Amino acid sequence: MKDAWWKEAVVYQVYPRSFMDANGDGIGDLQGVTSRLDYLQELGIDVIWLSPVYQSPNVDNGYDISDYQAIQPEFGTMADFDELLKQAHRRGIRIVMDLVVNHSSDQHPWFVESRKSKDNPYRDYYIWREPKADGSAPNNWGSCFGGSAWQLDPETNMYYLHLFAPQQPDLNWKNPKLRDDVYRMMTWWCDKGVDGFRMDVISMISKPDEMPDDPNAPVGGYGNFGAYCIHGPHVHEYLKEMNARVLSRYDLMTVGETAGVTIEEAQKYAGEDSHELSMVFQFEHVDVAGKYGAWRTEQIPMLFLKKVLSKWQTELHGKAWNSLFLGNHDQPRTVSAFGDDRPQWRVRSAKMLATCLHMMEGTPYIYQGEELGMTNCPFQSLDEFRDIDSLNGYRRWVTDGPLTHDEFFPYLLFKSRDNARTPMQWNDSPNAGFTCGTPWIRVNPNYTEVNAAAAMADPDSTFYYFQKLIRLRKAHPVIVHGRYELLEKDDPALFIYTRTLDDAQLLVMCNFKEQTREWTMPSGFAGAQVLISNTGRTQQAEQTITLQPYEALVLLK
C-alpha cells in the first residue's frame, strides 16, 4: 500500500461547544481550543478533527450551516480560527474541518433564495417536489430525526426534501452550479491551510431521479429512504469530481461518514486507486438496533464487536484504510458503552479498550475526554437534555408513543448523544474548569475524580496510557502496517489477535470481562518483550497466562 502521513497519524476529535470556554459564556469556543493545545501536544496526537464551527442557527448543534465561510459568533471570529490554525501548526498538529454538504441550514442564503419562487436561480440548489394529488408529501420517507422527510413550503406550495431536521434542507448535487459553489468553498478553506475534511453523511449526497414510496413502511408510519439515498446513483462520480477539482491539489486527509457502508462499498470510497477519500467511517460495530429503534440499554455483545472489527481489519487490508473509533459526538462514552464504568474498573477497562483499538491497522480517533476515561452522565430529568435526537426520541416513544417516562428514561441515559457532549473535565474546580459561567449543558458530577489535572498528576492514569499507545504507533511499523489475524474468534471474553509485518509479530490480548481467564499463548511469545500492559506486567515468562479482569497485554517478538 502507498505511504501517507495520515496512515501513521492519531486523530483527536474536538467538539468545540463542550471543550473549553475562554470567555465565560458557558459555551466552548475557538480561543478555548487554542488555550489547550499544549495539553493535546503532550498527549501526542497529530490531528485535531474540529466539529463544525461555521455560522449556524444551531438546530442540530452546528450541523445546520447558514454560512460555510463564517465562524459561529459564539465560537469566536475568523481571526480566532486563524490563530488556532497557526498555533496548532506551530506544534506540529494538523486541523481537519467537519464538512457538512449533504444539507445546509434553511437560513443559508441559497435556501432563502430557493424558496422564493419556482423560477429563482437558486431553486435547483435544493430538492423540490410537487405534492401528491391529495396534497400530501411526495412519498412516505421518514427523516433521521423522526417525522416526514418532506416539508411543505407555503410560498410555492411545493415540498422540499430534508433527510434530517426540517431546518436542514438537502442540497441538490445533481446541479453542477451547486457543486461548483461547494468546491469553491472547499478550496477557500484549503488555501487557508486546513489539512483535510471529515465529510458528514457524505454517502447520502446523491439522490435518485425517481423517489418512490418505501414499500416496507409500517402501516401509518414512515418509510426508510436508505435504499434510495445511501450510496446513491452518482455518489462516486461526485466524489471523484471533488477529488479532481479540490482534494488532489492539496496534501489532505479526508474521511467520509458512510453509515451502512459495506466492505465492497468502502473500497469504492477509499480504495488505494479510487481517487475519492482517504478513508471512511463505518458504523457496523456501533449502530446496533435496540428495543425501541436505535434506543437500547444494554452494551453491544463483545462477540459481535470482535466479529465486526475483525472483518474490517481482514478484508480491507491492502485494499483500503480503516478508521478506528469506539466513541464520537454521536455515541455514548466509550468506557460506558463497551467497558465497565464502575469506579473500581473504570481506569483499567478504559485502558483495555484503548489497547484493543489502537493496536489495530488504521487511523485511530480519540474523542475528547476518552483519554481521561470520561463516562456517561447521570442526567436526572428531561430538561437536562439538549440533543435534538434525544428530545425527538422522547417525543416519539413517550409524548406521542406507548411508553411512560420511567420506561423510556433509562434508554436516554444509556444512549443519548448528550453523554458525549457534557463539558470536558479539566480539573476539580467548579464546572470542571470548563467555564467560569453557566455551562450550556450539565457537567458530569464525577469531574471531581475524573479530570485532566488529576490524570496528569498520576503516572498510572489513562492519559499517560493513551500517550504511550500513541508513541508505540510511531515507533513500531508493525502497528501501522502489520497484517491482522484474530485468535479465539468464538470466545465471549477474550479479544486476542496478532499483527505481523516481516519478522515482527505482535500478540494483543484483551479480557473484556470481570473474571480472570487462563489462556495458552502461541509458541514463541513466552518471554517476549512487553510493549504495554494495563496491570503493570513487565514480563510473561510462561506460555500459559492468567489474564486479570479487564487486562490488556501486548507482546512483541
Q: What do these predicted regions represent?
A:
Residues M1-K557:
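Active-site and adjacent substrate-binding regions of carbohydrate-active enzymes
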